[in-house]
Amino acid sequence: MAKGKFERTKPHVNVGTIGHVDHGKTTLTAAITTVLSTKFGGEARGYDQIDAAPEEKARGITINTAHVEYETESRHYAHVDCPGHADYVKNMITGAAQMDGAILVVSAADGPMPQTREHILLSRQVGVPYIIVFLNKADMVDDAELLELVEMEVRELLSKYDFPGDDTPIVKGSAKLALEGDKGELGEQAILSLAAALDTYIPTPERAVDGSFLMPVEDVFSISGRGTVVTGRIERGVVKVGEEIEIVGIKPTVKTTCTGVEMFRKLLDQGQAGDNVGILLRGTKREDVERGQVLAKPGSINPHTDFTAEVYILSKEEGGRHTPFFNGYRPQFYFRTTDVTGTIDLPQDKEMVLPGDNVTMTVKLLAPIAMEEGLRFAIREGGRTVGAGVVAKILK
């Protein structure tokens, strides 16, 4: 049988399964691909194919992740599933697998467990915007009241971490039954209900090109007779010749005007997300712009120095530190294209951080960086990556 080709005309959404070990994340992932492939085309993936997740490196960190794809009536989904808890932590913090929404798998037989809580908290910290719940193994619970109790517990837990617990879609089912071809309410029907919930509850993500213009500065040149050219890859939005833009970060913010956009030695009237361009700036001196700043739509992003972050510290095996660090540790924080020194403030109950740990910390940078919540960074010592993090909350 020929493999059904995915039509790229459908909007694309990134999702993933999260939840406690052995609650059925991988079985559910296999069940979704199996049920939806028969209905909408695509490829069914077995449990073993997904469980044998290949190792990949994101920012020098080893992560095991399985990637599957499936489609529904209206969308194309890319879905990530990780075999181990540590892989989830790394994946979510590095943003290796960006999620527009997550499917939280909770065993109806066990209810919420420590990693259930931790994954919800991580989702909040790293900015996963939507969570849908699949109450798995519902075939193993005969008591309807017990099922209701577990549902209430999950809703309360979501609300505790600022997700709308009362409005969160909760689908009850059995991934195992669905995978075995059971056509009943807890089998195939539950998977179809879950797919419908994904389609309706997670909004179509904004495309990069629709965002506010932002380009990290990679290099700066002076071209005699023409002025200063800044090169980089446009991260989001569009810039048109003649538009005002701001140079943000490191130094006080200044306004300038884009007088030219160049790509592959051709002049364009605009550049957009994904383009590697040179942008000509009017009246800006070469020494006014440096690597590590960003060009942005005026007022769209501000420079900040103080923030809280969710951080993963590389293990010794990953090439990280061999020893713990303590409060007041001062490494470099690598944002987009440059390193800035910063001081780390640990939570009161945390005396030290060991290689391989993940931790919430407060950081104070020596120079301001154009920053938004959800921005990823690396922690470095002398050019060597020792950690990865994401801005959870801006303080100043």
Curated annotation (Swiss-Prot):
Residue numbers binding GTP: 19-26, 81-85, 136-139
Region (G5): 174-176
Primary localization: cytoplasm
Transmembrane portions of the chain: none
Region (G4): 136-139
A Pfam family it matches: GTP_EFTU
Record flagged with keyword Metal-binding: yes
Keyword tags: Cytoplasm, Elongation factor, GTP-binding, Hydrolase, Magnesium, Metal-binding, Nucleotide-binding, Protein biosynthesis
Ranges for region G3: 81-84
InterPro entries: EF-Tu_GTP-bd, EF-Tu_GTPase, EFTu-like_2, EFTU_2, G_TR_CS, P-loop_NTPase, Small_GTP-bd, T_Tr_GTP-bd_dom
Entry EC number(s): 3.6.5.3
Compartment annotation: Cytoplasm
Binding positions (Mg(2+)): 26
Family statement drawn from the similarity comment of this UniProt entry: Belongs to the TRAFAC class translation factor GTPase superfamily. Classic translation factor GTPase family. EF-Tu/EF-1A subfamily.
Function statement: GTP hydrolase that promotes the GTP-dependent binding of aminoacyl-tRNA to the A-site of ribosomes during protein biosynthesis.
Descriptive protein name: Elongation factor Tu
Natural source organism: Bordetella avium (strain 197N)
